[in-house]
Amino acid sequence: MKKAILFDLDGTLLPMDQDIFVKTYFGLMAKRMSQFGYKPDELIQTIWKGTSAVIKNDGVLTNEDVFWKCFSEVYGDERTKNDRVKFDDFYREDFPKVQSACGFQPLAKEMIQYAKQQGYRVVLATNPLFPRIATEERIHWAGLLPSDFELVTTYENSHACKPNLLY
């Protein structure tokens, strides 16, 4: 039987002060989305509401579906459906600037390579609150590649979050 090592990303492979990270992240998102009529305070409050719902996910839906269902309750199904591409654009174009709120762990790549050389299955078990695009971006900030891991948890492929036992 092959054994696995599960690594966390935020604060482990990718050093960060979570408060600074969140402030930078939400500030950039609010600025970007305000040009599409989103009120910054309402948007951030809605994101926290969706995040809270994801953390409480009972496992029936993916974390992604739980988040966007919550978002739709505030902004409506049609607007949510139409604007999801705008959020994807944010993650492609603006989210990379959030790297300035993170540090760098020079041993991260070496740790992952060593674990794989020892025959371990290597999983990035980061709390799946983010879409794949944002998680993969943060993996790159850590000097790693998504392909360094057998599995990377994201809100698209997960039905629960830490510390839920379903995770």
Predicted regions and their residues:
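Active-site neighborhood of HAD-like aspartate-dependent phosphohydrolases
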Residues: 1-49
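Short, solvent-exposed loop/turn segments at secondary-structure boundaries
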Residues: 17-20, 58-59, 99
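Conserved Lys-Pro-Asp/Glu-containing loop-to-beta segment of HAD-superfamily phosphomonoesterases
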Residues: 151, 160-167
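Short helix-capping segments at alpha-helix termini
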Residues: 34-40, 78, 143-148
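Short, surface-exposed alpha-helical segments at coil->helix boundaries
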Residues: 23, 65, 132-137, 165
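Substrate-recognition element of Asp-dependent hydrolases with the DxDx(T/V) motif
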Residues: 89-92, 96-104, 108-142, 152-153
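A metal-dependent, Asp-based hydrolase signature
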Residues: 45-92
